[in-house]
């Protein structure tokens, strides 16, 4: 095979996982602060909006605003409308219970909170299939929750889909054994560590890896100060450096404003980094300049979703590679 053909082959081989064909998002019908998840999601806050209906209305407005910006950037967004049949206050965060992979493969995950398990709704896949998206293989890890083991999708794991590495910060919601099982099934190399943030002068585990770390093709945004073990920190830095990624550090105060909960999406127009307005406002000029070398920054206000749900823009998006 000629050199050009080899290069072209590898580009085509990687294209499915490099370029996002489309996105799944769940439009909420019952969004509110989830008491079940607040046990270990310490990013959730009680906000001044008192009425449940007002919280829902604000969250829908924020959701629709983000969708509009995604579409404007050229991304196909499949929107599944949640209903009131099930008590699913966190349905707006689908990336925790389902991930999509090349070769028409999906994975379904075990969830810590009982009311989040209701989000695994067959109707979501039926909706996507009605849009001519086909899925030939399902890896279902959900039964592990019956034994008290959890792995909440790309919340628990930050995937480097090009270099096939899964970065995973352990917590009540993230099992080391399940991470290893996923990595065996999908041929990823696990990089497992612990990360913390300071709450009332005490170091508490960060509930999801994607709050402290955002993986992009050419760079990684990460709060290295949240990793207390020097050996674990050095291992991550080496892994990122070996993959020739520029490391863009954020502080713990920026982490608290969801500066780690961003997502790079790439299409024919180029690389875009989507984030919340609060995350963007937390960045300094140097960080913005570093990101802008590689990606167009797009930010959207999701204050209600962040404060009530304890998650931000990255959590709202499930990338589809099909």
Q: Residue locations for each model-derived region?
A:
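The feature marks the mature, well-folded catalytic cores of soluble enzymes
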Residues: 11-322
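Positively charged N-terminal leader segments that act as targeting/secretion signals
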Residues: 1-7
């Amino acid at each position: 095979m000629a050199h050009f053909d080899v290069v072209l082959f590898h580009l085509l081989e990687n294209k499915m996982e490099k370029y996002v064909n489309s996105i799944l998002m769940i439009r909420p019908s019952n969004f509110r602060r989830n008491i079940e998840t607040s046990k270990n999601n310490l990013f959730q806050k009680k906000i001044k909006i008192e009425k449940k209906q007002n919280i829902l209305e604000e969250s829908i407005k924020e959701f629709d605003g983000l969708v509009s910006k995604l579409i404007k950037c050229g991304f196909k967004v499949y929107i599944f409308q949640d209903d009131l049949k099930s008590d699913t206050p966190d349905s707006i965060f689908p990336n925790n219970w389902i991930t999509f992979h090349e070769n028409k493969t999906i994975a379904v995950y075990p969830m810590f909170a009982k009311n989040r398990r209701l989000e695994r709704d067959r109707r979501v896949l039926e909706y996507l299939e009605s849009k001519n998206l086909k899925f030939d293989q399902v890896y279902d890890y959900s039964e592990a929750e019956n034994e008290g083991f959890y792995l909440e999708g790309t919340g628990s794991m930050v995937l480097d889909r090009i270099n096939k590495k899964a970065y995973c910060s352990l917590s009540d919601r993230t099992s080391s054994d399940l991470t290893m099982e996923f990595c065996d099934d999908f041929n990823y190399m696990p990089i497992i560590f612990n990360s913390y943030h300071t709450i009332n002068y005490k170091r508490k585990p960060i509930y999801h890896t994607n709050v402290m770390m955002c993986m992009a093709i050419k760079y990684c945004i990460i709060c290295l100060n949240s990793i207390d073990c020097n050996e674990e920190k050095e291992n991550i830095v080496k892994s990122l450096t070996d993959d020739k990624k520029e490391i863009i550090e954020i502080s713990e105060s920026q982490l608290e404003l969801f500066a780690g909960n961003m997502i790079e999406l790439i299409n024919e127009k180029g690389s875009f980094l989507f984030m919340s307005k609060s995350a963007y406002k937390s960045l300094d000029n140097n960080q913005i300049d570093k990101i802008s070398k590689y990606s167009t920054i797009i930010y959207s206000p999701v204050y209600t979703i962040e404060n009530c749900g304890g998650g931000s823009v990255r959590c709202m998006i499930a990338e589809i590679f099909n």
